[in-house]
Amino acid sequence: MSARDIVAINREFYDALWSQTYVERPERFNTWPLISGLLPSAPLRLEIGPGLRPRLPIAGTHFIDISTPVVAKLKARGGIAAPGEITALPFGDETFDLVGAFDVVEHIEDDRRVFAELGRVLKDGGILVFAVPLHARFWTEFDACVGHARRYEPADLLALLADHQLVIEKSAGFGMQPNNPRLLKYGMKWLTQHRAAAMRWYNWVFMPLGMLFQKRLKFRPGLVDPAGLAEIVLVCRRLPR
């Protein structure tokens, strides 16, 4: 699949997903204890590809998203939102103290360019918080449906970070995707055959239920043992130039 095809799949899927739902408050996510602890030293903030589930506080944060409904709704809530892509961020070098990108990087074919851009806009010593799915062996129809270009092998991810002067401070297992094969297969059937109805159920039933049953993130210094993890969230610091 070409990079252009992946972008088109992402835009079509997420425009439809976000066009008829609401902005969730960042404070409701299990990432909030982490994010809120970073805010005092992060006056300049950017979140990329938040959808309507931002993890950084909306007011005063810059947001970049490919989805038009997302940009409009975040602006209405006080965010500094603009359309754009993670491979060409419309900001100068060394702009931000904190950058977030949750479930975004895996959607981009040219991930080296992604990390080059993330490292470019971060100040020296700035923090990158991002989440990606792990292990090609866990690839499912869902990955293809939502526009994933890959799932990461831990060694490849470590090499990418090192190449772009990003050092892992801590990490944890992450994600809300169901791991029950039958449930996933049933969900995929609805997504492919009854997409509009499936998205309504996701936005108004399954996502709210998932929020109620979120588990506390268990961070470990450096890279948490990735064996068996389907997804990971990492806190990285930008080394001085």
Describe the function of each predicted region.
Residues F102-V105, A131:
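Residues lining the SAM
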Residues R45, L122, D143:
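Short glycine- and Lys/Arg-enriched binding-loop motifs that mark or flank ligand-binding interfaces
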Residues M1-E94, L98-F102, R112-F115, A172-F174, ...:
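Conserved N-terminal segment of class I S-adenosyl-L-methionine
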Residues A3-F13, L17-F29, E109-E117, I127-L239:
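S-adenosyl-L-methionine-dependent methyltransferase catalytic module, highlighting the catalytic core
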Residues T31, R120-K123:
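Short, cationic motifs built from Arg/Lys/His that form the positively charged side of catalytic pockets
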